[in-house]
């Protein structure tokens, strides 16, 4: 199963995903996060190949010409994209995958795949979003205001998703994310594929 996770900048999405991957009890089955390619500069603390693959605009556009991306979008004048090969190599091993992408990428994937569930994460208020962006210390006030305006434009698309999480309290939001993924992993359509051999033996 492929899980699309989208949220405006500053909502806490990256922290939630990293916490989810560190959780030992949940989800029930193995899950990995796809590492996207981007043309933006690395931020302090980021590691190439762990947070993103940081490449040039020329390299990115060459990959576009090669139809290498499952999805891609231009956000804040930077490219972001998910390589088709990386996603396929994970899914072929019956491992669930998380895609940290925006609504534009989600729309592209929905058009070509059916094995998808989508989750949209929003902040409890604009004031709280502003506080988080300011606390992050990465942008000037003008850029923060631009990000908030962009966040509103992104949040308009929340009804296009299967699930909605309000990240007011981090631990509650993490629990909600765990619950959604565990429920999907237990869905009949997924379980009968995952345990096809076991079920076949039981019914002989």
Swiss-Prot record:
Molecular function (Gene Ontology), one example? guanylate kinase activity
Could you name the domain of life of the organism this protein comes from? Bacteria
EC number(s): the record gives 2.7.4.8
Q: Where in the cell is it found?
A: Cytoplasm
Domain named Guanylate kinase-like: residues: 1-182
Q: What InterPro entries does the database record attribute to this sequence?
A: GK/Ca_channel_bsu, Guanylate_kin-like_dom, Guanylate_kinase, Guanylate_kinase_CS, P-loop_NTPase
Catalyzed reactions: GMP + ATP = GDP + ADP
Q: Which residues bind ATP?
A: 7-14
Checking SUPFAM superfamilies in the record gives: P-loop containing nucleoside triphosphate hydrolases (SSF52540)
| Residue stretches spanning the membrane | none
One Pfam family this sequence matches: Guanylate_kin
Keyword Cytoplasm attributed: yes
Q: Which UniProt keywords apply?
A: ATP-binding, Cytoplasm, Kinase, Nucleotide-binding, Transferase
Question: Record's Gene3D superfamilies?
Answer: Guanylate Kinase phosphate binding domain, P-loop containing nucleotide triphosphate hydrolases
Q: What main location does UniProt list?
A: cytoplasm
Q: Does the keyword Transferase apply?
A: yes
Gene Ontology cellular-component terms listed: cytosol
PANTHER family reported for this sequence: GUANYLATE KINASE, GUANYLATE KINASE-RELATED
Record HAMAP family = Guanylate_kinase (MF_00328)
Briefly, what is this protein's role? Essential for recycling GMP and indirectly, cGMP.
Family affiliation: Belongs to the guanylate kinase family.
Q: What is this protein called?
A: Guanylate kinase
Q: Species name for this entry? A: Baumannia cicadellinicola subsp. Homalodisca coagulata
Task: Tell me the name of the encoding gene.
Answer: gmk
């Amino acid at each position: 199963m492929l899980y699309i996770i989208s949220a405006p900048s500053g909502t806490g999405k990256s922290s939630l995903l990293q916490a989810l991957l560190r959780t030992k009890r949940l989800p029930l089955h193995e899950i990995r996060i796809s590492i996207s390619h981007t043309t933006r500069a690395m931020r302090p603390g980021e590691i190439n190949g762990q947070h993103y693959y940081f490449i040039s605009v020329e390299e990115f556009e060459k990959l576009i010409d090669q139809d290498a991306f499952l999805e891609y979008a231009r956000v804040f004048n930077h490219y972001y994209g998910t390589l088709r090969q990386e996603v396929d190599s994970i899914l072929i091993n019956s491992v669930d995958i998380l895609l940290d992408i925006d609504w534009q990428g989600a729309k592209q994937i929905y058009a070509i795949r059916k094995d998808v569930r989508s989750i949209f994460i929003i902040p409890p208020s604009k004031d709280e979003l502003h506080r988080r962006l300011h606390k992050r210390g990465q942008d000037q006030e003008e850029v923060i205001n631009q990000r908030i305006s962009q966040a509103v434009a992104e949040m308009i698309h929340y009804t296009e998703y299967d699930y909605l999480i309000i990240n007011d309290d981090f631990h509650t939001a993490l629990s909600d994310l765990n619950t959604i993924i565990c429920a999907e992993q237990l869905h009949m359509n997924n379980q009968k594929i995952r345990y096809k051999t076991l079920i076949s033996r039981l019914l002989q």
